UniProtKB/Swiss-Prot annotation:
It comes from Rhodopseudomonas palustris (strain BisB5). This is Phosphatidylserine decarboxylase proenzyme. Its cofactor is pyruvate. Keywords: Cell membrane, Decarboxylase, Lipid biosynthesis, Lipid metabolism, Lyase, Membrane, Phospholipid biosynthesis, Phospholipid metabolism, Pyruvate, Zymogen. Belongs to the phosphatidylserine decarboxylase family. PSD-A subfamily.
Length: 232
């Protein structure tokens, strides 16, 4: 393998949603260079950051039935029992909820935590308070999705944050998702909540780093065989 190919192999692809933003940053950088070179270099750093924000690296997802993987890169901010939002239609009993906070430095492409059918997608307008606060799950702009699996229904909620102002969904109701398949993106910092079926036991802890499509959040078949993987 040549040096150029080796370098290219280490650079993750950029998601198409980022092209307009990267282009705008690059154009602004050119203007800044014309005004004053030091400003141009600051613009260059910001353009590189923007490109990294929209990176979309390949992930190797465990695909054995019963596994729930992280839908987002970031830090596990909460592992709690919580009544799901009424919009999800998952009942009024507390369910295990895993929350993952994404900083502006994380990859923001979101991936399906399970294999299943998208039953409902509900968009809710709202505020843009700090996504790390628990009340953000009720007050902030969010996009909720319910996925049906053999083990029960999984609720996935994309929550906009203090900086994030745009939730993007790539899927539609009735669509079948593979585990780790891309389903959306949130621009510039946010949170993902995953509501597990009653009785499920989360396998992650608060403060743990999660990798979208790879980190296992729960396993409905603990002790049953090994895991197989898919790369995408």
């Amino acid at each position: 393998m040549s040096v150029v190919k080796s370098i290219r192999a280490q650079i993750p692809p950029i998601h198409r949603e980022g092209y307009p933003f990267i282009g705008a940053f690059a154009l602004a950088t050119l203007v800044l260079f014309l005004i004053w070179a030091p400003l141009g270099w600051i613009g260059t750093v910001l353009t590189i950051w923007c490109a990294l924000f929209f990176r979309d690296p390949v992930r190797v997802t465990p695909v054995r039935e019963g596994l729930v993987v992280a839908p987002a890169d970031g830090r596990v901010s909460m592992v709690v029992q919580m009544i799901p939002p009424p919009a999800l239609g998952l009942g009024d009993k507390p369910l295990p909820r895993v929350s993952i906070f994404m900083s502006v430095f994380n990859c923001h492409v979101n991936r399906s935590p399970v294999a299943g059918r998208v039953e409902r997608i509900i968009y809710s307008p709202g505020k843009f308070i700090n996504a790390e606060l628990d009340k953000a799950s009720e007050d902030n702009e969010r996009n909720s999705m319910v996925i049906s699996t053999p083990a029960g229904q999984i609720g996935v909620v994309q929550i906009a944050g203090l900086v994030a102002r745009r939730i993007v969904s790539f899927v539609r109701e009735g669509q079948t998702l593979a585990p780790g398949e891309r389903f959306g993106l949130i621009r510039f910092g946010s949170r993902l909540d995953v509501y597990l079926p009653e009785g499920a036991k989360p396998l992650v802890s608060e403060g743990q780093t999660a990798i979208a499509g790879e980190t296992v959040l729960a396993d409905f078949n603990l002790g049953d065989g090994g895991r197989t993987y898919r790369a995408d």
